[in-house]
Curated annotation (Swiss-Prot):
GO annotation terms (biological process): regulation of DNA-templated transcription; regulation of RNA stability; regulation of translation, ncRNA-mediated
A cellular-component GO term for this protein: cytosol
Oligomeric form and interacting partners: Homohexamer.
GO MF terms held by the record: RNA binding
Annotated protein name in UniProt: RNA-binding protein Hfq
UniProt xrefs under NCBIfam families: Hfq, PRK00395.1
Function description: RNA chaperone that binds small regulatory RNA (sRNAs) and mRNAs to facilitate mRNA translational regulation in response to envelope stress, environmental stress and changes in metabolite concentrations. Also binds with high specificity to tRNAs.
Cystine pairings recorded for this chain: none
Family from the record: Belongs to the Hfq family.
Record keywords: RNA-binding, Stress response
Species of origin: Saccharophagus degradans (strain 2-40 / ATCC 43961 / DSM 17024)
Pfam families: Hfq
């Protein structure tokens, strides 16, 4: 996993696992709403009444409907929260 994905992947994974409704704003201003069904390096699969494949390069902002706690990882893959008592 590249360094650029050290926050993005865990964040999207929490949204997916907890089925948190999100609003995704695209760079052209369009707002999409739904739940993150899946994602990879290039796309996010957003599910509402239908599934939409949204290319990450077109995404400006992801806004969850409630606060999200993301488990941060150290370079070796261990949880930073474990060491800090979090």
């Amino acid at each position: 996993m590249s360094k650029g994905h050290s926050l993005q992947d865990p964040y999207l994974n929490v949204l997916r696992k907890e089925r948190i409704p999100v609003s995704i704003y695209l760079v052209n201003g369009i707002k999409l709403q739904g739940q993150v069904e899946s994602f990879d390096q290039f796309v996010v699969l957003l599910k509402n009444t239908v599934s939409q494949m949204v290319y990450k390069h077109a995404i400006s902002t992801v806004v969850p409907s409630r606060p999200v706690r993301v488990p941060l990882l150290n370079a070796d893959g261990t949880s930073a929260e474990d060491e800090n008592g979090g």
